């Protein structure tokens, strides 16, 4: 696996449904910025957006579905940066440089989206669930396969799972807001540096 992978393009939707989706997500973001996640409910979103409750329910299913949709929307932007943005996150840098940059950017993304990620939990799933193989797993496996020389004696498939867990695991998702209030930059730097230390040691030939 050594080519960029597109992580599941969304299915085609009717023009009116697409307009409603964009409007609802924009409205939800406005409400988040003004009131925080606790006040963002299905009923409140329907009222603020000027749409019927049935429309909101069909679009999101549950309150957690609103936050999953917000997370998915931002994930898509992040994926585009990985696939076609400037190096070292995007193409054009050496695989190890891209792996380091990806982990740093991914950790920043998860910390920045910690409130949305927690609100996306619906009680029946341990972490926000997706319909596809986690993007971190796909991308990390691709970059590991491009390393030259390759690390000797390693199971790249299992290493991929371990490295992806270091980024997408519950430790990052459950970092408390109180813990991060005055130290977000410090956490991002420390997690990013720890990721770089890890992959540089593991990927050493």
PLM regions with names:
Residues 1-8, 138-153, 160-162, 166-205:
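C-terminal peripheral helix-coil segments that are non-catalytic and often amphipathic
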Residues 27-31, 69, 109, 166:
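Short amphipathic alpha-helical elements of helix-turn-helix/winged-helix folds
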Residues 79, 101, 105-112, 121-150, ...:
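Amphipathic alpha-helical packing segments from all-alpha helical-bundle domains
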């Amino acid at each position: 696996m050594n080519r960029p992978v597109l992580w599941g393009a969304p299915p085609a939707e009717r023009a009116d449904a697409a307009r409603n989706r964009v409007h609802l997500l924009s409205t939800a973001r406005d409400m988040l910025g003004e009131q925080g996640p606790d006040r963002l409910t299905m009923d409140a979103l329907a009222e603020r957006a000027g749409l019927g409750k049935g429309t909101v329910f069909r679009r999101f299913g549950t309150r957690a579905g609103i936050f999953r949709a917000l997370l998915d929307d931002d994930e898509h932007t992040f994926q585009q940066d990985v696939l076609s943005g400037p190096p070292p996150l995007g193409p054009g840098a050496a695989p190890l440089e891209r792996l380091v940059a990806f982990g740093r950017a991914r950790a920043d993304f998860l910390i920045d989206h910690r409130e949305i990620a927690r609100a996306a939990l619906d009680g029946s799933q341990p972490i926000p669930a997706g319909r596809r193989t986690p993007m971190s797993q796909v991308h990390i496996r691709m970059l590991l396969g491009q390393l030259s020389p390759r690390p000797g004696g390693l199971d790249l498939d299992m290493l991929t799972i371990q490295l992806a867990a270091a980024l997408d695991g519950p430790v990052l998702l459950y970092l408390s807001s109180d813990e991060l209030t005055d130290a977000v930059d410090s956490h991002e730097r420390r997690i990013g540096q720890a990721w770089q230390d890890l992959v540089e040691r593991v990927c050493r030939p």
